[in-house]
């Protein structure tokens, strides 16, 4: 299916791995010009190489700490200077940080909010003047179902993800007059670098518990009976960014194999 993304300009934060990289690949395959941002330049370079080799379309990798507003401003400027505008912003950067209240430090809380909330605010704030000039502008925030139905011991992530969902709804109304659509995808259990790292920290040298065993254990709570692949989330992001989803705004869409108890 041609989604109508040919020539569109997209910025994806947290784009060097996992869901962000998958979304970048999907958009690039559809003909979009994609800039991916992350902190680790070596991982960015590898992602750019991987995507370019598969699509032969322009891809930028820009090292950016989205917790720093000046760095985000520079990211936006570099993309605009290179390609002339912005049509799509995907606020994807973030990691899982979970704790019970009695164990959570103020530093942990602050760090999570800076990354997931301030990062999205900075990106949207500085991309907005250019998104207003686009004829098909889209903002997509990635959150989790836990932002709608948090479990015990999942703060501060539950707080920051709920904020992301709230910002999505607020911005969808605030920016509608400029024909800017804003949606969020709520990501469930997806095979990602974060989960691989979690397995490696405790089981990499344990031959009795492989990474596949880890995925199988995680899948037991998922109604579809498996852990999702990054490209399954990336393809949904790509669709939401396209004109094929032109009447979808203010939505929060679960990509979780049916795990969440809420819609």
Regions found by a protein language model. Name each.
Residues 144:
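Residue(s) in the substrate-gating loop at a strand-loop-helix junction
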Residues 184, 208-244, 248, 255-257:
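C-terminal helical subdomain
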Residues 124, 160, 168:
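Active-site helix of classical SDR
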Residues 2, 149, 237-238, 249-263:
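Short C-terminal tail/terminal secondary-structure segment
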Residues 129, 173-177, 246:
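Alpha-helical segment proximal to the catalytic Tyr-Lys
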Residues 100-101, 105-113, 218:
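Substrate-binding pocket helix/loop in short-chain dehydrogenase/reductase
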Residues 9, 16-17:
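Conserved glycine-rich cofactor-binding loop
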């Amino acid at each position: 299916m041609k989604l109508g993304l040919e020539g569109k300009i997209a910025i994806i934060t947290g784009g060097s791995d996992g869901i962000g990289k998958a979304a970048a690949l999907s958009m690039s395959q559809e003909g979009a010009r994609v800039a991916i941002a992350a902190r680790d330049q070596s991982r960015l370079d590898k992602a750019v190489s991987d995507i370019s080799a598969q699509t032969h379309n322009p891809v930028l990798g820009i090292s950016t700490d989205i917790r720093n507003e000046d760095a985000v401003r520079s990211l936006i400027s570099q993309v605009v200077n290179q390609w002339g505008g912005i049509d799509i912003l995907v606020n994807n950067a973030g990691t899982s940080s979970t704790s019970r209240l009695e164990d959570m430090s103020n530093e942990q809380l602050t760090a999570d909010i800076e990354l997931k909330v301030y990062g999205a605010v900075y990106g949207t704030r500085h991309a907005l003047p250019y998104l207003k000039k686009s004829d098909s502008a889209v903002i997509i925030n990635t959150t989790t179902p836990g932002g709608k139905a948090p479990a015990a011991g999942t703060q501060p992530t539950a707080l920051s993800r709920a904020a992301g969902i709230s910002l999505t709804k607020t911005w969808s109304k605030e920016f509608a007059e400029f024909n800017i659509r804003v949606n969020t995808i709520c990501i469930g259990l997806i095979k990602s670098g974060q989960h691989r790292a979690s397995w490696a920290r405790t089981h990499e040298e344990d031959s009795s518990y492989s990474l596949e065993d880890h995925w199988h254990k995680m899948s037991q709570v998922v109604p579809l009976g498996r852990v999702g692949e990054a490209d399954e989330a990336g393809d949904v992001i790509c669709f939401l960014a396209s004109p094929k989803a032109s009447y979808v705004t203010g939505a929060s869409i679960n990509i979780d194999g049916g795990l969440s108890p809420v819609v």
